[in-house]
């Protein structure tokens, strides 16, 4: 298992895996991931994309200056830590919107699978943050 976090440029340029009118089995796609981190663009609807993310452990502090993110947890326990010290804890079938410009980091408590809806070319800015 690997835990490679892509660069901001690689994240923004991730290609769409499935074209319209293709049925996608998200459970099978998630089960095929053996890495501790994988975030892939499954499909695109207009200017928004659906990402499937598998995460175990921490993702670095960052923000998306011009894109909100909507997270929907499918499996496991998922946390979003905010710069002000709050921690949002989500379980399967819970969702939250993180507004554009919000400094945060995500964490999979064990293996976590979530869906993320965001702008197709959402910019990611990694930031220094002292906890």
Predicted segments with their positions:
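Short acidic-glycine-tyrosine-enriched beta hairpin
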Residues: 84-100
């Amino acid at each position: 298992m690997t835990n490679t976090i892509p660069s901001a440029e690689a994240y923004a340029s991730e290609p769409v895996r499935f074209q319209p009118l293709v049925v996608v089995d998200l459970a099978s796609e998630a089960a095929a991931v053996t890495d501790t981190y994988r975030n892939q663009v499954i499909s695109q609807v207009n200017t928004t994309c659906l990402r499937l993310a598998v995460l175990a452990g921490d993702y670095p502090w960052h923000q998306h200056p011009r894109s909100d993110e909507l997270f929907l947890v499918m499996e496991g326990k998922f946390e979003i830590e905010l710069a002000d010290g709050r921690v949002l804890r989500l379980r399967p079938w819970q969702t939250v919107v993180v507004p554009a410009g919000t400094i945060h980091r995500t964490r999979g408590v064990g293996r976590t699978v979530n869906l993320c809806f965001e702008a197709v070319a959402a910019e990611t800015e990694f930031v220094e943050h002292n906890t």
